Amino acid sequence: YREYYISDKDYYCYRKGVFACHENITDSNGEQISNPYFADLQNGDIILTLSIHSLGWRHGHATIITDAEKGIGVQAVMVGEKSTYSYTSSWMKYPLVAVLRPKNVDKETRDAVALFAQQNLQGLDYSLLGGITSGRNAQKVPRATQCAHLVWYAYFACGVDVAPKSGLIITPKDLLHSESLEIVQVYGSILEV
């Protein structure tokens, strides 16, 4: 099983929106398939992929799990769309996926973060510059966000900084390489991208 999780997968790329391209895994016949499952998802976990790119930049995407039992998270998707819920099953199609969990953060805090995200971070406008105008010390919910900033803000609002070394714009790669987060599960060679 280990080899399946870390091996590279065949994939095809399709355009979503004006600039973004999404990679989906395929079988040997070119048919879309899914990774088997996520192990032990918990509220507050972060799922991210680096299988999304725009104009040559592999920026990726991230979501925060708000109801692990039902497989639901909250995400900011793209310009022109409001942040909304997502199903974890939609993340199974990507060839490069990681599940992250904050180090030294108890279940009670992660549950509070999930509840905060569910109640406060849906319906926000999307902004590529999410976080710049509100800053890293914002005390109120931002009006606009992007995927990694939404994840970061959910934790930050509850007293935890999951990307303390990131710059003004928090990216999925900042989350992936954050010393404050541990890897729970990976699909593909995401750590080599």
Predicted features, each with a name:
Residues 1-19, 134, 139-193:
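Activation targets extended, charge/polar-rich intrinsically disordered C-terminal tails
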Residues 1-75:
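N-terminal accessory segments that precede or flank the first globular/catalytic domain
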Residues 41-104, 131-142:
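Glycine-rich catalytic cores of cysteine/serine-nucleophile enzymes that process amide/ester linkages
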Residues 56, 123-126, 160-161, 184:
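Secretory-pathway/luminal and periplasmic proteins that interact with or process carbohydrate-rich
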Residues 75, 80-82, 86, 108, ...:
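Boundary regions of SH3-family modules and the immediately adjacent low-complexity/disordered segments
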Residues 98-156:
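Long, low-complexity intrinsically disordered regions
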